[in-house]
Design a protein with these regions (language model features):
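N-terminal cap/lid segment of alpha/beta-hydrolase-fold proteins
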Residues: 9-52
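Short substrate-entry loop that stabilizes the transition state in hydrolases
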Residues: 53-56, 61-96
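Alpha/beta-hydrolase active-site loop
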Residues: 101-125
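Hydrolase active-site cap/lid region
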Residues: 140-187, 245
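Short beta-strand/loop motif that positions the catalytic acidic residue
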Residues: 201-202, 208-210, 214
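Acidic catalytic loop of the alpha/beta-hydrolase fold
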Residues: 212-217, 243
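Short alpha-helix in the alpha/beta-hydrolase fold that links the catalytic acid
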Residues: 218-226
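C-terminal catalytic histidine-bearing segment of alpha/beta-hydrolase fold enzymes
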Residues: 227-260
């Protein structure tokens, strides 16, 4: 895992934040910001913070998919902010269909984006020892990697992701595009498998949520990842689909993140 830590690290940890817009609504403050993830990547993000109360937590809320999915989690971020957390939703993009080298590069950039987002949280007032990460689907994939390489995290939530997911989805994508599945591709997907990363000892508490009716990531894959994970960990399973977006699911995540 030392190689993974080097791959997902930067020599410098300073971050500069630019605010392009700000407004207040329903007891929270909304900001549109940009920051640098590395020397060549400028990231757009939404930051939601409490209005008129002390910040008790900092949380990154990472969307799934390969494009900007912040809109699916804005209400959840607002609810956590109303509970005392400052929440950042950074945009990440990954390209699983563009070959191994490009995919590895975009995964690295996405992980560096999430790590820089933690720096932004601290810069904007989050207590450094309270940092949390929540990731849905592909965002959960990033959360699994961060479990192994980001020591600042106090709590991690991974929902709707599991062991073997990257291998299954990337190979299916390759075949659907008419490309051959090579041994190099299989080895690369195996190296990035989530179960490998969550098995590393860490201080962060880990919550894994999964829906039994998830057609994208079978519940068995989520359970396999949970079984591989190091302690401390918690498993919550629901009679639901891939989204895990009901109020109960959101409340369980918020309770885990916001608990003192």
């Amino acid at each position: 895992m030392a190689g993974a830590r080097r791959f997902f690290d930067l020599a410098t940890r300073s971050v500069s934040v630019s605010v392009s817009g700000e407004h207040e609504h329903a007891g929270v403050v909304w900001r549109e910001v940009t920051f640098a993830a590395d020397s060549s990547t400028v990231v757009t993000a939404t930051v939601v913070s409490p209005l008129g109360q002390r910040v008790t937590r900092g949380a990154v809320l990472a969307h799934g998919g390969t494009e900007d999915g912040r809109r699916f989690f804005l209400s959840e971020a607002a609810a956590m902010a109303a509970g005392g957390a400052i929440v950042i939703l950074p945009v990440t993009r990954m390209r699983p269909q563009d070959g191994i080298d490009m995919f590895a590069a975009t995964v690295r950039t996405a992980v560096l984006t999430e790590r820089a987002a933690l720096d932004v949280l601290v810069e904007m007032g989050a207590p450094p020892d309270t940092l949390c990460f929540l990731g849905h689907s592909a965002g959960g994939f990033l959360g699994a990697i961060l479990a192994a390489v980001e020591p600042r995290l106090a709590r991690i939530v991974i929902f709707s992701y599991g062991a073997g997911t990257l291998i299954r989805t990337s190979l299916a994508t390759t075949l659907s595009c008419g490309g051959p599945v090579t041994n190099e591709m299989t080895c690369a997907a195996d190296w990035f498998d989530a179960a490998r990363f969550v098995a590393v000892d860490r201080r962060a508490e880990l919550l894994i949520q999964h829906g039994r009716r998830d057609r994208d990531v079978p519940a068995e894959a989520g359970r396999e990842m949970f079984d591989a994970a190091a302690q401390p960990k918690l498993w919550l399973e629901y009679d639901w689909d891939h989204g895990l977006a009901s109020q109960r699911h959101k409340d369980d995540r918020a309770k885990f993140v916001l608990k003192l």
